[in-house]
């Protein structure tokens, strides 16, 4: 299981790149200075038109990690309510190599 860094020291509200998720279990990890920011793992069931939060376990207001299980979809990280000193990084890993790609 390898981690892919999908967010590198983000300092503004916005979204990471979109990643194709084949299917199965994974893990999201976020770290950094939050300063009021909220970080959410989101999925799109329709190739990027609609985005919904994966769940409360993968919504962060402080550094942490969470497991998730989703069917084939696109994934991204959403950051909102950043503060003056917010600087956040995030990683996603898959249970099986090759389950995630740009």
Predicted regions and their residues:
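Short intrinsically disordered terminal tails
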Residues: 1, 101-102
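Short proline/glycine-enriched turn/loop motifs at strand-loop junctions of beta-rich domains
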Residues: 33-38
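Surface-exposed loop/edge segments in extracytoplasmic proteins
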Residues: 2-5, 47-56
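Structural beta-strand segments of beta-rich domains
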Residues: 24-26
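Beta-sandwich interaction modules
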Residues: 13-22, 53-101
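Conserved Ser/Thr-centered positions that define the repeating blades of beta-propeller domains
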Residues: 42-45
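Extracellular beta-rich ligand/substrate-recognition surface
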Residues: 3-14
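Aromatic/hydrophobic beta-strand junction motif of beta-rich domains
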Residues: 28-32
């Amino acid at each position: 299981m390898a981690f892919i860094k999908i967010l590198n020291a983000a300092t503004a509200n916005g979204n990471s790149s979109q990643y194709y998720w084949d299917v199965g279990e994974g893990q999201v990890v976020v770290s950094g200075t939050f300063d009021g920011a909220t970080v959410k793992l989101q999925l799109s069931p329709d190739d990027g038109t609609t985005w919904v939060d994966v769940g409360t376990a993968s919504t962060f207001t402080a550094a942490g990690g969470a497991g998730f299980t989703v069917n084939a979809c696109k994934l991204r990280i959403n950051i909102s309510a950043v503060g003056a000193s917010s600087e956040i990084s995030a990683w996603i890993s898959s249970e099986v190599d090759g389950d995630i790609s740009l």
